[in-house]
């Protein structure tokens, strides 16, 4: 949402007008259809064209340029060039607090590049990759991932879990949606377990995996779940 707001401020400045107050529809349609999360898509009645901002998702070779744009976005109050570059990649559809961008792997499949923040005092991305490696070794399902370096900074590349290798979209909902809660609401593991029982096609299997992930989070000291 912040990137879409920055883009609107930049357009308003270029057009000599006051920035519009954006609503939920603006945020939904301000996302690239190519990189939109899950399987939800939008189009007008009678049209075959899906709605969303156009994007050109770059290959991994563009990581240095994308990292530079990410740093600019974090340091500048209204970095128009950085906003445009990240919008062009379809980055607006990606949630979470860490700076990131959409990229394509060598086989053409969609992935996420997670960048270090300029204010990081330790190698956050390297430790996130280490946590994923530990989970995979313990038998917990993790997305295919790789750690790469640009200069002396780590970038974590994660294959999108909501796309097949052929690009077919896989629908999903967040834990917040599953529990019917809003940002800031206090929910616990029991609430999410109940939602899994109500909504899952394979509740027994999913509850076993959910339990494994709870134990892994505790073992790793993850307090951001």
Functional labels for PLM-detected ranges:
Residues 1-223:
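Phosphate/dinucleotide-binding and metal-coordinating scaffold of catalytic cores
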């Amino acid at each position: 949402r912040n990137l879409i707001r920055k883009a609107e401020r930049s357009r308003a400045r270029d057009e000599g007008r006051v920035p519009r107050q954006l609503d939920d529809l603006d945020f939904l349609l301000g996302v690239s259809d190519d990189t939109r999360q899950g399987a939800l898509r939008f189009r007008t009645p009678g049209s075959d064209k899906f709605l969303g901002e156009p994007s050109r998702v770059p290959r991994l070779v563009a990581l240095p340029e994308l990292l530079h744009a990410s740093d600019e976005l974090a340091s500048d109050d209204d970095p128009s060039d950085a906003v445009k570059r990240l919008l062009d990649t379809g980055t607006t559809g990606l949630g979470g607090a860490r700076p990131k961008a959409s990229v394509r792997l060598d086989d053409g499949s969609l992935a996420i590049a997670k960048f270090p923040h300029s204010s990081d005092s330790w190698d956050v991305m390297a430790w996130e990759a280490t946590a994923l490696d530990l989970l995979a070794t313990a038998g917990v399902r993790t997305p295919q991932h790789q750690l790469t370096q640009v200069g002396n900074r780590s970038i974590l590349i994660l294959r999108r879990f909501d796309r097949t290798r052929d690009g077919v979209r896989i629908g999903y909902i967040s834990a917040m949606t599953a529990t019917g809660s809003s940002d800031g609401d206090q929910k616990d593991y029991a609430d999410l377990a109940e939602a899994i029982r109500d909504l899952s096609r394979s509740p027994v299997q999913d509850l076993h995996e959910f339990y494994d992930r709870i134990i892994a989070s505790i073992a790793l000291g993850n307090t951001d779940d």
